[in-house]
């Protein structure tokens, strides 16, 4: 649990001024603020400086104006919510990338929050600050379709997790869906081998992929290497970033990532690494289009 000064510091990080009693309205405010202010990212992985996913380490990332990916983001968010008096449940989950089958791989830390309704019954909500292409607000853990801005989500029973559920993402999203196991996890120990693979293995999809994402009320942003994608109700606009100054400006202004843990020299090295891979990617695309 966080101390009161830590709670206040965390809330300041995401732009919330006052502590409130647990409620659906406050939960939604916290969720919107978190996914807007704290990006999902692979920065430390690409830089070769992965951060442990222990809950204390994940909270420190937030308090130091840094970020991470699902294990860090949902881990820290779950601690904040519990410290504010919410009933939070952690779950083993698996993200289904495009072109692959649904799976319960344990490569995602899922969260639900229980709130007591006027009849005294607990109503569960899916909350997720760690999907990258995440929902903007909590989603009721009930079968149905839910629209948030230009994105549409569907909740249904999982076919790979007995007694679990599935969140189907919008057709234009970066992944197809995510399946959740119903069992509650008291700690995140079982995720540590997955984190070790994702953060250090050459086979990891994030090993050399600089990727930063966040949400806002009208859509989402993504910076994949040097390609900035802006998605809203009108579609997706892609912008190629061709200078370090513009790249750092987009990181700071759009994603609120100022690379505070990196020196000027390290930021230069990171940019050159990302730019080099971007040029290699463009060359590969050109060769594929002109065999």
Whereabouts are the PLM-identified features?
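N-terminal accessory/pre-domain segments preceding catalytic cores
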Residues: 1-24, 83-84, 160-291
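Hydrophobic/aromatic-rich core segments of domains that either
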Residues: 75, 79-155
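Secondary-structure boundary elements
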Residues: 1-65
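Generic structural "secondary-structure junction" signal
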Residues: 40-47, 64, 133, 141-143, ...
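Short N-terminal helix-initiation segments at or just after the protein's N-terminus
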Residues: 49-60, 151-159, 173
